[in-house]
Every structure is written in structure tokens, then in C-alpha cells.
Amino acid sequence: MCKIIAVANQKGGVGKTTTSVNLAASLAVTKNKVLLVDLDPQGNATTGSGVEKSNLDFSVYDLLVGSLTIQDVLITQTADYDLLPSNSDLVAAEVELLKGENREIRLRKAIAHIRDHYEFVLIDCPPSLNMLTINALVAADGVVIPMQCEYYALEGLSALMETIKAIKEELNPHLKIEGILRTMYDPRSKLTSEVNGQLFNYFGDAVYLSLIHI
């Protein structure tokens, strides 16, 4: 049975793409069939998967707002997992999705056609709570949230939690938090320790015990 996981945080530079690519590679190495969806216009997950963005004929943009099928866009000859690639064309998708019908469920409908072929689908989200991220959360079964223990981190995390709550109520009642992953963790920093303590106070068991050091 396929599990779809969105890797999301509206703050940039917290390790979303690094988490997505390494998780995809790790799951693939353990003989799981994995699809990585690059939903960030920066396309760093695409580059990190060994695909040159400038050479793409099609990207996930063509899947979300065009007439192409997922098979038209899918790249299977890369790394140890399959990829739905992204490039800067995806910037325009935000505006075009806002004008279209069924705008929140485009990705879910696309993935529905192929999800039985995979054990895991990982979605690398953009660093904002826009229509692309909403598409990811509507399509997902769970959310992994990478975050740094830094100033304003909890404020941003609270905004994401509110978005997840709204999507659960309106569009995807089965969505759940898989866990919060602390990244770029600096144990020498007093601020890091303070935010880390607050994180456990607010979210408890939702915080992964494993962490990524700076």
C-alpha cells in the first residue's frame, strides 16, 4: 500500500529538499519503489536527483495546469527512484491554478493514477503556504516538517499547523503529522536549546528523537 508524504515548511532554508532527496534515496536503497515529486519552482530536488533542469521537455507544471499525463512527465532513469521534475515554469502554476477549477486537487488526481505502483511518494514542497503546497497537503497521507530550532521557528510552525488543520477539515480528513524533524541543530546555542524545549512542550511525541546536526 502506497504512503504519500509531503515534506513541508513555509520557511526556506530548513532542509526540506535535503530531507526529501535523502529520504527518497534511503527508501529506494531498502528496496522500496519510490516516487519523488519536486513541487518547488527552484527545482533543487530535481538537480539533487541528477537531472538537469534546463534540459527538461516537460515538468510538473505541465501536469498541474497542462493536458499531459503523469506518464508524460515522469522520469524513471535517474538515481534509484522515479521523479516528477520541476523547473522555473512552475512559478506560473500558482497564478494559473488560482483561475482553474478543482485547483486544490490537481496533484491528488494525477497521483491517483500511479500510486499503486509505489510504496512511497514523497513531495518536496515550496517554501510558502501557496496553492502548490495546498495541492501537496491535499494529496498526502502525512506530513514531515523539517525545522531549525531558531528565532520565530515556532511562529512559522504554528501557521503551517493551522493550514494543515483547515485542509483536514475541508479537503483531506485523513491527513496527519508524521513528525517534526529538527535540522541544522546546534547544541552549543542557548537559543537552540530554548526553542528545542518549547518544541517538545508544544508538540511532544510529534517531534522525532533523531535530529540533523549543523
What are these regions (language model features)?
Residues M1-I212:
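P-loop NTP-binding core
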